[in-house]
C-alpha cells in the first residue's frame, strides 16, 4: 500500500470514528493504480471515479447500523461525451440476487470498465456513464464489498429500504451537487423489488418535506429529484412470473407437450395457480411456484445430444439466464457470465482494493453473491413490488426492459404482469398504447440493427431487447445504452407509412474505444476549430484576421439560428414517449431464490448472439394482444391456453 493510500484510508477511518463524513475528494480513485488503465492511449476517455465505503450510521443510538457500510463506485465523464440533459442525470445502478454485488454491473454490464482474461481493465465503449453519472452500490449490507459487521442482516424489503435511504442521505452530503440532478434508479433481476421499494420511500420522504416545512434537515430540506425507474429483466411479481415458466419454455421449444414429464409440469403449474388464486396478495411468493423452473431444468437435463453422442458435463443443463447457452448440472447458469473469473482476478490483484479505499484487513475478498444476505431476506410480512407500481406510475416514468433469451425473469412473465396490472384507470396496455420498432444504427459499419421493440402508455414503457440475456448490457452494451437514449429522448423517430410501425432509431452521438491510437478522425466541426486555433496562433496580431473571425462568428451564429428554426418548423411530430411528460397534452444466490443450494461447478460455453431477432417476444399488430398465462375462473390449467 502506498503512503498516500494509507493516509487517505486513515483519514476516512478517523472521520467515520468521529461521526463525520469524508469529503468527495477523499473517495477519488487514481486510475493509474487500476491494472490495465495505464495502457489506455487516450487518457481523456478514462472517467473520473470515486469509490469506497459510505457509513449508514446517522447518529441514532436506537439502531444497530454502526457497522453497516455500503460500498459504491461512481463514474463521471470527463471527455464531453454527454449531452446537456445527460450531464444533469444521476443513475444509481443496483444488481439483484438478493445478495449479488453491483460490481457485476460496473465491470460486466453498464459500467465504464470491462475486464480481460488477464484481469486487466479496459474501457467499455458502451458504458452508460456517457448518459449520466452512474453510481454502483453494493447493498443490502453484506453484499459484495459492503459490510454488515456484528449488525443484523436485513430480513425484509422495508429494512432494506430504510438502509438505502440512510445511504442516500449520506451520499448527498458527500456529493451535494448531485442533489440538483435528475435521479434515475436502474438495475436488474431482484432489483425489480429493490427499485420500486426505494422509489416509494423517496416519495414518502419528499412528501414529508412538503408537510413539514419547518423541519430542519441536514441536507437543507431538498427533495430528491427522482424522475424514472429502469428495471431490466426484473423480478417484480413472483406469482405471475412463476406462472410464465411453462408457457415461455413451450414458446421457445425448451420443453414439449409430448414429453413423458409434461403432465407432471402441468400438475405443478396447477398447484401454483391455485395457491396464487387463493393468496390475496398476502404471501410474498410460493416455493411451489418457484420450483417449477427447478423441475424444468431437471427434466430437460441432457445426457446425449440429438445424434446420440454423450454431452460434456459442462453442457448438460440449460442456462437459466440465457437459454442459448448450457452449463453443468445443477449449476444451470451459476457459472455464467464468462467474464466472472476475470472480474474476481482483477479485484484480487494487489493494489486494487487499496485504490478503491477498502481496508483489506477488514473487508473480505470479493464474492459475486452472498448466500447469507439471501437466506435472511425472507419478506415474511411484505408484499412484492408489483403492488407499488400503480402508484409510482402516477409520479414518474417506469421502464421495464427485457432480454428475450432469459428464462428466470423472462419476457413472457413481465408482459403478463403488465397485462394484469391496473394503473391510470386501465388494466394493461390498451389499444391506444404506442408501439415502435427499435433499431440501432452502428456508425462504424453503417449498419442498422433490429434491436427490439418499444411499447408505451401512461408513464409505463416496455422495451424488448432482441438476442439478449438476463444481463442485457453484458450482451451488447452499445445497444443497451439505447434504453437510456430513449429515456433521455436522444433518439430519432421515423414515422411509419402504409400501415408500417413507427421506428425509433438509437445511435451513439459519441462512441470512443480505448483501443484507439488517440488520433481518431475529427468531425468537420472539430477540424474547423482546430484549423481556426492554428490560424490564430500564426496571425495573432493580424487585424484582418480578427475581423475575419468576427465575421465568421456572426455568420455561424446566424446560420445556426436559422438551422434550428427551420428544423423545428418542419420536423415530424414526435410521439408522446419522446415528449417531456410535463408538456404532454392530456390523453437466489445469483438466481431469484430458485436454488440457494445450487453447486457451482463446470464451465459454460457461449454461442454467437449474431442471429436473427426473436419473434416469440414480439406482440401482434393488435397493440393490446399478449399471449395468455393460464388463469381460469375454476382455478384449473387449460392446455388450450398454451
Swiss-Prot record:
Pfam families, alphabetized:
Peptidase_S10
Q: Which UniProt keywords apply?
A: Apoptosis, Carboxypeptidase, Glycoprotein, Golgi apparatus, Hydrolase, Membrane, Protease, Signal, Transmembrane, Transmembrane helix
GO BP annotations of the record are: apoptotic process; proteolysis
Documented EC number(s): 3.4.16.6
- Location within or outside the cell: Golgi apparatus, trans-Golgi network membrane
**What is the membrane topology here?**
Single-pass type I membrane protein
Residue spans, topological domain Cytoplasmic: 566-642
Task: Write down the superkingdom of origin.
Answer: Eukaryota
Q: Region (Disordered) spans which residues?
A: 515-539, 609-642
Signal sequence segment? 1-19
Q: Does the keyword rRNA-binding apply?
A: no
Kindly report every residue range on the membrane side named Lumenal: 20-544
Question: Bias category Acidic residues: which stretches?
Answer: 519-532, 632-642
- Name the glycosylated positions: 80, 425, 459, 467
Is Zinc-finger among this UniProt entry's keywords? no
Q: Which GO terms describe its molecular function?
A: serine-type carboxypeptidase activity
Specify the enzyme's EC class, one word. hydrolase
Q: Which GO terms describe its cellular component?
A: membrane; trans-Golgi network
What function is annotated for this protein?
Protease with a carboxypeptidase B-like function involved in the C-terminal processing of the lysine and arginine residues from protein precursors. Promotes cell fusion and is involved in the programmed cell death.
Q: What is this protein called?
A: Pheromone-processing carboxypeptidase KEX1
From which source organism is this entry? Kluyveromyces lactis (strain ATCC 8585 / CBS 2359 / DSM 70799 / NBRC 1267 / NRRL Y-1140 / WM37) (Yeast)
**Gene it is expressed from:** KEX1
Amino acid at each position: 500500500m502506498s503512503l498516500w493510500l494509507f493516509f487517505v484510508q486513515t483519514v476516512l477511518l478517523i472521520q467515520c470514528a468521529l461521526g463525520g463524513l469524508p469529503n468527495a475528494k477523499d473517495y477519488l480513485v487514481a486510475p493509474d493504480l487500476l491494472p490495465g488503465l495505464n495502457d489506455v492511449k487516450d487518457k481523456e476517455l478514462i472517467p473520473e471515479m470515486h469509490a469506497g465505503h459510505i457509513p449508514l450510521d446517522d447518529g441514532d443510538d436506537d439502531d444497530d447500523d454502526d457497522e453497516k457500510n455500503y460500498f459504491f463506485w461512481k463514474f463521471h465523464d470527463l471527455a464531453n461525451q454527454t449531452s446537456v440533459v445527460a450531464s444533469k442525470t444521476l443513475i444509481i445502478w443496483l444488481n439483484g440476487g438478493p445478495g449479488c454485488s453491483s460490481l457485476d454491473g460496473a465491470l460486466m454490464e453498464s459500467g465504464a470498465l470491462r475486464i480481460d482474461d488477464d484481469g486487466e481493465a479496459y474501457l467499455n465503449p458502451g458504458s452508460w456513464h456517457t448518459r449520466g453519472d452512474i453510481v454502483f452500490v453494493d447493498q443490502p449490507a453484506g453484499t459484495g464489498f459492503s459490510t454488515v459487521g456484528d449488525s443484523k442482516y436485513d430480513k425484509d424489503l422495508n429494512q432494506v429500504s430504510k438502509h438505502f435511504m440512510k445511504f442516500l442521505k449520506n451520499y448527498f452530503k458527500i456529493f451535494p451537487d448531485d442533489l440538483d440532478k435528475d435521479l434515475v434508479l436502474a438495475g436488474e433481476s431482484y432489483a425489480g423489488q429493490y427499485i420500486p421499494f426505494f422509489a416509494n420511500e423517496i416519495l414518502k420522504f419528499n412528501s414529508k418535506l412538503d408537510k413539514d416545512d419547518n423541519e430542519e434537515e441536514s441536507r437543507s430540506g431538498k427533495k430528491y429529484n427522482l424522475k424514472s425507474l429502469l428495471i431490466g429483466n426484473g423480478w417484480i411479481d413472483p406469482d405471475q412470473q412463476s406462472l410464465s415458466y411453462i408457457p415461455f419454455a413451450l414458446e421457445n421449444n425448451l420443453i414439449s407437450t409430448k414429453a413423458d414429464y409434461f403432465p407432471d409440469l402441468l400438475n405443478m403449474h396447477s398447484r401454483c395457480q391455485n395457491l396464487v388464486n387463493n393468496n390475496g396478495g398476502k404471501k410474498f411468493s410460493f416455493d411451489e411456484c418457484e420450483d417449477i423452473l427447478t423441475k424444468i431444468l431437471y427434466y430437460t437435463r441432457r445426457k446425449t445430444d440429438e445424434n446420440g453422442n454423450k454431452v460434456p458435463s459442462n453442457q448438460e443443463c440449460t442456462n437459466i439466464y440465457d437459454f442459448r447457452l448450457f452449463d453443468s448440472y445443477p449449476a444451470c447458469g451459476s457459472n455464467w457470465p464468462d467474464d466472472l473469473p476475470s472480474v474476481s482476478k482483477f479485484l484480487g490483484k494487489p493494489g486494487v482494493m487499496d485504490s478503491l479505499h477498502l481496508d483489506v484487513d477488514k473487508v473480505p475478498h470479493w464474492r459475486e453473491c452472498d448466500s447469507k444476505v439471501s437466506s435472511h431476506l425472507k419478506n415474511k410480512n411484505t408484499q412484492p413490488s408489483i403492488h407499488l407500481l400503480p402508484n409510482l406510475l402516477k409520479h414518474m416514468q417506469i421502464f421495464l426492459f427485457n432480454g428475450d433469451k432469459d428464462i428466470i425473469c423472462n419476457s413472457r412473465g413481465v408482459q403478463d404482469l403488465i397485462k394484469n396490472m391496473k394503473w391510470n384507470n386501465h388494466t394493461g396496455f390498451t389499444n391506444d398504447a404506442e408501439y415502435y420498432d427499435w433499431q440501432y444504427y452502428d456508425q462504424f459499419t453503417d449498419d442498422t440493427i433490429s434491436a427490439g421493440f418499444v411499447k408505451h402508455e401512461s408513464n409505463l414503457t416496455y422495451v424488448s431487447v432482441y438476442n439478449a440475456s438476463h444481463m442485457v448490457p453484458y450482451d451488447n452494451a452499445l445497444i443497451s445504452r439505447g434504453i437510456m437514449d430513449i429515456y433521455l429522448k436522444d433518439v430519432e423517430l421515423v414515422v411509419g407509412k402504409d400501415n408500417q410501425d413507427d421506428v425509433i432509431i438509437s445511435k451513439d452521438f459519441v462512441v470512443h474505444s480505448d483501443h484507439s491510437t488517440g488520433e481518431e478522425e475529427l468531425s468537420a466541426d472539430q477540424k474547423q476549430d482546430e484549423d481556426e486555433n492554428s490560424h490564430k496562433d500564426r496571425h495573432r496580431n493580424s487585424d484582418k484576421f480578427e475581423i475575419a473571425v468576427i465575421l465568421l462568428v456572426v455568420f455561424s451564429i446566424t446560420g445556426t439560428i436559422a438551422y434550428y428554426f427551420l428544423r423545428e418548423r418542419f420536423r415530424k411530430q414526435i410521439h408522446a414517449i419522446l415528449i417531456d411528460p410535463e408538456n404532454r397534452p392530456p390523453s437466489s444466490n445469483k438466481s431469484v431464490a430458485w436454488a440457494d443450494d445450487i453447486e457451482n461447478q463446470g464451465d459454460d460455453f457461449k454461442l454467437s448472439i449474431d442471429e436473427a431477432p426473436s419473434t416469440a417476444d414480439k406482440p401482434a399488430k393488435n397493440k393490446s394482444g399478449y399471449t395468455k398465462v393460464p388463469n381460469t375462473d375454476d382455478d384449473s390449467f387449460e392446455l388450450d391456453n398454451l
